[in-house]
């Protein structure tokens, strides 16, 4: 959700500051099929979580870790593009948090309530995986590397209430920087390789 917001904000900022959307066609992201695979795998894992059809938690958690490994690989080979340094840091932070917590991203019950998911919290015991997400309800005292987990809250009236991690914020900033920077490059400048 945070990355989606960053894309729209960056496009708006780029346009308001007289950037050219046509320049975005210049971006050449190497290994982009791995990024598509990562997004598809994560969407499948999150979408099938509620139906319990993806298998036991280790398999599902493994799918979430795998998506972040793929994202980190794509970010690493594109490190020379504007914003990809932040994307690498964010993807690495998320991967470390996931691995440290068994492949799931801890989120506090208070954060879930703040974004309007009281019913979900009431139904879940501490340590239970959150259906339809990669999250697990854990208080800060039980989460490994708590500072890297989903601790930032975007509550209502935000259009898409969500919780985010430090990694999510870094990835969002990197994506936003890539978009704005690219919109302000002239068409003669090649971005990426």
Describe each model-derived feature in a short phrase.
Residues 180-192:
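Membrane-interface capping segments at transmembrane-helix boundaries
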Residues 112-163:
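Extracytosolic (periplasmic/ER-lumenal) interhelical loops and adjacent juxtamembrane/interface segments
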Residues 70-101:
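Interfacial segments of alpha-helical transmembrane regions
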Residues 70, 174-181:
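Transmembrane alpha-helices and membrane-interface helical segments
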Residues 1-67:
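Transmembrane alpha-helical insertion/packing segments
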Residues 58-66, 161-173:
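Membrane-interface loop-to-helix entry segments
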Residues 53-56, 82-87, 104-115:
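A cytosolic-side transmembrane-helix exit/cap motif
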